Amino acid sequence: MEAERINLIGTTLEDLTERTQELRRYLDYDAKFERLRTVNASLEDPAVWNDPKKAQELGKEKKSLDAVVLTLQKLTTELADNAELYEMSKEEGDEAGLTTIEAEAEKLRPLIEELEFRRMFSNEADPLNCFVDIQAGAGGTEACDWASMLLRQYLKYAERKGFKATVEEETPGDVAGIKSATIKIEGEYAYGLLRTETGVHRLVRKSPFDSSGGRHTSFASLFVYPEIDDSIEININPSDVRTDTYRASGAGGQHINKTDSAVRLTHIPTGIVVQCQDGRSQHSNRDVAWQRLRSRLYDFEMRKRMEEQQKLEDTKTDVGWGHQIRSYVLDNSRIKDLRTNVEVSATQKVLDGDLDVFIEASLKQGV
């Protein structure tokens, strides 16, 4: 094996070791290790199952801690072992040994990159589940169809990530597609990954609804906000909330809703509107709507504290050119993020939920 390649293996091991040590400091390995010991001890106590909710929270925390602690332990041990073997193989001229070390180093690299990616989640709500609101904008039937394509795209994205996705509200379009929908996505760092998807998404294509085959431009907006739990206190003055009930829309049939079971809540001071119609009763829809309102208000206050607050309802009331984040030009096989300038040509792959290249670029650039 040539000297240049041998030296490169050594340099690679040094680089990976330095990055691992930096991650141990940044991710506060020692504190997480001690916390993991405490959590494991609690889960081993049979009494913990007397409170299933608490046990579930501990199980979730253990999974998150394991991902950091066990990975850092593996990296530290294996990099040290490989560094020792490298010196021995280098002295003995053991090419097979050096080749093995080279391969092992490349196996460890993605583990480091995954932990480094976690460093970009600085928002306190990043680890939480999230809601994704989709709303058709300018473009009529074409926009409603585009909104339904985005609904499918984010359901596919959740599937790729191993997240649980539930369509909690869906309002069909007059001709095709949807006017609006809300997805609940449950998984580790669901909000952190998807929060930069908030904004207007533009579609340019030859419309299947236009017999002349003309190109149409349409818009749909996304609004992503975290699901907050009961441990976060959000005080809402009931007099600030207007409640409207209406008949849930649907395809009909024997289960068609003949009562005003759908609920819409409007928080008057902020203009935030949430709605729910999927439950069979007004009571269940009201409970879900209030949960979403609490989540929306938490997100609103958090953004204001971080001096990042924007007019949150702009993405719903002005779904057009001015708020675009991504452009999908299907005829030219081009999807471009207008904030990061990341551009891809594999349009169907993206529409099938492969959004990682856009999301990672947004997080890395601090969008």
UniProtKB/Swiss-Prot annotation:
One MF annotation (Gene Ontology) recorded for this entry: translation release factor activity, codon specific
Keyword Secreted tagged: no
PROSITE patterns in the cross-refs: RF_PROK_I
UniProt KW Cytoplasm keyword: yes
PTM statement from Swiss-Prot or TrEMBL: Methylated by PrmC. Methylation increases the termination efficiency of RF2.
Disulfide bridge partners, by residue number: none
Main location: cytoplasm
GO cellular component, one term: cytoplasm
Keywords assigned: Cytoplasm, Methylation, Protein biosynthesis
Modification sites for N5-methylglutamine: Q254
One Pfam family per UniProt: PCRF
UniProt subcellular location: Cytoplasm
Function: Peptide chain release factor 2 directs the termination of translation in response to the peptide chain termination codons UGA and UAA.
Family classification: Belongs to the prokaryotic/mitochondrial release factor family.
Protein name (database record): Peptide chain release factor 2
Organism: Acidovorax ebreus (strain TPSY) (Diaphorobacter sp. (strain TPSY))
